[in-house]
UniProtKB/Swiss-Prot annotation:
Entry-linked Gene3D superfamilies: PurM-like C-terminal domain, PurM-like, N-terminal domain
One cellular component term from this protein's GO annotations in UniProt: cytosol
EC number: 6.3.3.1
Highest taxon of the lineage: Bacteria
Family membership noted in the UniProt record: Belongs to the AIR synthase family.
Record-given protein name: Phosphoribosylformylglycinamidine cyclo-ligase
Pathway: Purine metabolism; IMP biosynthesis via de novo pathway; 5-amino-1-(5-phospho-D-ribosyl)imidazole from N(2)-formyl-N(1)-(5-phospho-D-ribosyl)glycinamide: step 2/2
An annotated Gene Ontology molecular function: ATP binding
Species assigned in the record: Streptococcus pneumoniae (strain Hungary19A-6)
Amino acid sequence: MTNKNAYAQSGVDVEAGYEVVERIKKHVARTERAGVMGALGGFGGMFDLSKTGVKEPVLISGTDGVGTKLMLAIKYDKHDTIGQDCVAMCVNDIIAAGAEPLYFLDYVATGKNEPAKLEQVVAGVAEGCVQAGAALIGGETAEMPGMYGEDDYDLAGFAVGVAEKSQIIDGSKVVEGDVLLGLASSGIHSNGYSLVRRVFADYTGEEVLPELEGKKLKEVLLEPTRIYVKAVLPLIKEELVNGIAHITGGGFIENVPRMFADDLAAEIDESKVPVLPIFKALEKYGQIKHEEMFEIFNMGVGLMLAVSPENVERVKELLDEAVYEIGRIVKKENESVIIK
């Protein structure tokens, strides 16, 4: 018995791994950008920081996954957008610190290497990288029989970006009186899916619920996370933004306070929040308390900006999309987030 056959008998298909690498090359090529050095397949991805033109570069990194949204991708056998979710979760975090994404690495672990399926996953990662302007410079695909079921896989990623030292957004510039602007989310994004799956556990995904405006449930649940990089970078370059909050797990309550000092609070006018239909459906069918929704989900606002009043109109002009004035920064009395 050869080593190759012995390995195959243990459940690891080396040839399938080679096939995955060949399949994903064209997707990786889409993400090429200035600064990338070397080719796919090296022991480490390389990037020439001098190509960014940043005078005082500070590297900012972020890592994340997509949680149990993966279980719905597997359930509905749709794998071509979950990679975008993974990229979004990472790059939206680092843009909140003022960083332009430079490159991305992904990690996929699976019980059985299915090249066609994994190509779809990486194609989604590549699409996310294109939207973020980041190069996909490396990754790992691990076949782990016994750790995962044959149809199961997990996905995580790691993003690195750069900011001018003087343009880092760390909350120190947010002051009382700043206006809170909300940028629309595309849907649930990638948080709260353990609850989402419980609410819709008995649904096939083919249902067209009256709240969902003609869309199938599975389409809404797997809507990829919006990537905010290209919308927000021009604002950072012009130093128009004092604070940024990426609304992820923990909703408004946990994430908004992360962009300002402990002596401040966010006062939010609930009537100005563009609540998406899926959140109304979740609240109704899951019998979730209304106030708890803001502790779990983005409620239609995926990114929140704190902006000086005199810069609001310029920010709206540059964004060229629907921008929601949903509140303001006030002095903290008790709670860090007040929703009225």
